[in-house]
A protein has these predicted regions:
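Active-site regions of metal-assisted phosphoester/phosphodiester hydrolases
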Residues: 1-105
């Protein structure tokens, strides 16, 4: 599913709401990762509410080298039904986003 770029939060919230329908009905572990385009405080708030409502935990990176826009990280990993073992951000010039790596058990 694609979370499109738009300036308002209404479309963003609707897209995440559409995604939440699928996640709510999923039985078993979940890993949800990608570029969420959460480049503003209102978008970050919508994304965090989305994750809380679905009981998704956010992967926290000790050395947070995630790609940012306007000081906000764009890329996230959320999970449920798993335990986080390790998380890191690789620094590379192979893409305009640094890869996020997380291992779970």
């Amino acid at each position: 599913m694609q979370i499109n770029f738009s300036f308002g939060v209404d479309v963003y919230q609707r897209q995440l709401s559409n995604l939440s329908v699928h996640i709510m009905h999923h039985k078993g572990p979940i890993i949800l990762a990608g570029d969420f385009n959460a480049w503003s405080r209102p978008r970050v708030n919508v994304l965090k509410r989305f994750a809380r409502r679905l009981r998704l935990k956010e992967v926290i990176f000790d050395n947070d080298w995630r790609t940012k826009a306007f000081g906000k990280p764009l890329d996230y990993i959320f999970y449920r039904g798993l335990s986080l073992n390790k998380a890191e951000v690789l620094i590379t010039d192979a893409s305009d986003h640094h890869p996020l790596i997380a291992t779970f058990y």
